[in-house]
Amino acid sequence: MLLQRQFEMPESFFVLSKDYLELATDEITALAKMHDRFSKIKIISNLVIVQSKTNWNEISKRATFVKISGQILRKMSGLFLDEENVGVLKNAKTFVCRIINLSSNQINIPELENSMGDMISKFSHAKVNLENPDITVYLIFTNNENFFGFSKRTKKMARTKKIKKFPHELDWKLTRVMINLIGLEKGETVCDPFCGTGTTLLEAESMGIHGIGLDFDEKMCKIAKANLKTNGYNSEI
């Protein structure tokens, strides 16, 4: 039964920035396992494939170094599309095709994207929209496998703002990764004993995690409070 359950679980893909790639892949793994301990992970360079019951966007919206993400529909042995492949466009009014080449082969990306768009148009009533499509269709090339996938339009998360900064404060990306590697879930609490300008608290609150901050410097506590207030967060300082 377990094998059948895993076989039927959908696959998601995450194309990561190559900055801190090892941390980035560990973060995706931690987030996937946090939501579903039966998740299976496959890493191909800066592409991470996750087989899990968890929706790709639940992982992507918390991850730090994800450039592109979505759901895999199938592996591709060739560039052949049929009605089954484009069924995801059934209720979409607009779409765009995007090629992600992670292989060592030279590919004429604009030409291939146009060809894909033409093929999809034969099976779907959706129109091409390059700026703000309902669905983005992806063809991902690697040296060993090709994948056909998609993502639906999602609302972009606003970055937290700081009205006051400090030269030696924590980098927000590394801070967010650390929180995610710990595996804290929404509604849980993180405590930062040296909160400084509030970077850890801001990142935690942006993911629905409560924060408690301490600092021996009263000036830093005031700065952290001001930064939290600007974003409407209520971490305890």
Locate the predicted segments by residue.
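Acidic/proline-rich low-complexity IDRs
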Residues: 1-2, 88
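An N-terminal amphipathic alpha-helical segment
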Residues: 75-91
